[in-house]
Amino acid sequence: MTTPIPTPYEDLLRDVLANGSHKSDRTGTGTRSVFGRQLRFDLADGFPLITTKRVHFKSIAYELLWFLRGDSNVGWLRENGVSIWDEWADERGELGPVYGVQWRSWPSPDGTHIDQIQQVVDTLRRDPDSRRIIVSAWNVADIPDMALAPCHAFFQFYVADGKLSCQLYQRSADMFLGVPFNIASYALLTLMVAQQVGLEPGEFVWTGGDVHIYDNHIEQVNEQLSRNPFPAPALRFARRPESVFDYRYEDFVLEGYRHHPAIRAAVAV
């Protein structure tokens, strides 16, 4: 008997369709929404890139590298053919103190800045049992200056039995467009950090707050749910860079990504 392919993401889409409340939202689009859901992905079972539609891995990888640069301008993304942040950028390409700035340069009261990512790597090497291996993008003082408040706001690393796991808290979860990117992005980051600190990959745990499907995505979601999934692809590294900040797109080797065609949908801005 063939073992069914797990479909936690697609199962959550069905949950939102069946149980979601109708809510208004900042964009004026309207959503079906549930509150407080969790998905778990064992990274030993493959790389969690959704197969029931094509997900653009290049954009995911370059966005993560852009975060790790501590960048707040879309110029570097555009140079590499990635346009996913263009809708929020100003005429100079600026977004304000968004994810990368908070990850790499969190402002301290004394005028210095904290590199949260470097702290994560250092703590994993020095004290892997710490319960404080955390990165936050939710800087309350800076939110008014951000083009978009952080949706994926807070993540924590955890080490047990020689394996590195990561849990993300996503306060606002656009299930059709955003969440497939977020799952793959943080799974990739977990694999990168695990390689850097000499641990095996464990789980990626995704926790969502306001988990929603936009009203203008319902048709696309139903089309996606009519498709049978393929087995998860694999992700390996072409080399081991000197640090977590030295990875290049060419270092990520995605193998065996079978997928259904892409499904187009409008972004709620």
Curated annotation (Swiss-Prot):
Catalytic site: 151
Enzyme class: transferase
Binding of (6R)-5,10-methylene-5,6,7,8-tetrahydrofolate, residues: 56, 174, 268
Catalytic activity: dUMP + (6R)-5,10-methylene-5,6,7,8-tetrahydrofolate = 7,8-dihydrofolate + dTMP
Principal location listed in the UniProt entry: cytoplasm
Compartments, record wording: Cytoplasm
One GO term (biological process): dTTP biosynthetic process
One term of GO molecular function: thymidylate synthase activity
Keyword Glycoprotein found: no
GO cellular component assignments: cytosol
Gene3D superfamilies registered for this protein in UniProt: Thymidylate synthase/dCMP hydroxymethylase domain
Domain of life from the UniProt record: Bacteria
Enzyme Commission no: 2.1.1.45
InterPro entries found in the cross-reference section: Thymidate_synth/dCMP_Mease, Thymidate_synth/dCMP_Mease_dom, Thymidate_synth/dCMP_Mease_sf, Thymidylate_synthase, Thymidylate_synthase_AS
Keywords, ordered alphabetically: Cytoplasm, Methyltransferase, Nucleotide biosynthesis, Transferase
Stored PROSITE patterns: THYMIDYLATE_SYNTHASE (PS00091)
Assembly information from the UniProt record: Homodimer.
Family listed: Belongs to the thymidylate synthase family. Bacterial-type ThyA subfamily.
Free-text function comment from the UniProt entry: Catalyzes the reductive methylation of 2'-deoxyuridine-5'-monophosphate (dUMP) to 2'-deoxythymidine-5'-monophosphate (dTMP) while utilizing 5,10-methylenetetrahydrofolate (mTHF) as the methyl donor and reductant in the reaction, yielding dihydrofolate (DHF) as a by-product. This enzymatic reaction provides an intracellular de novo source of dTMP, an essential precursor for DNA biosynthesis.
Protein name stated in the entry: Thymidylate synthase
Organism encoding this protein: Leifsonia xyli subsp. xyli (strain CTCB07)
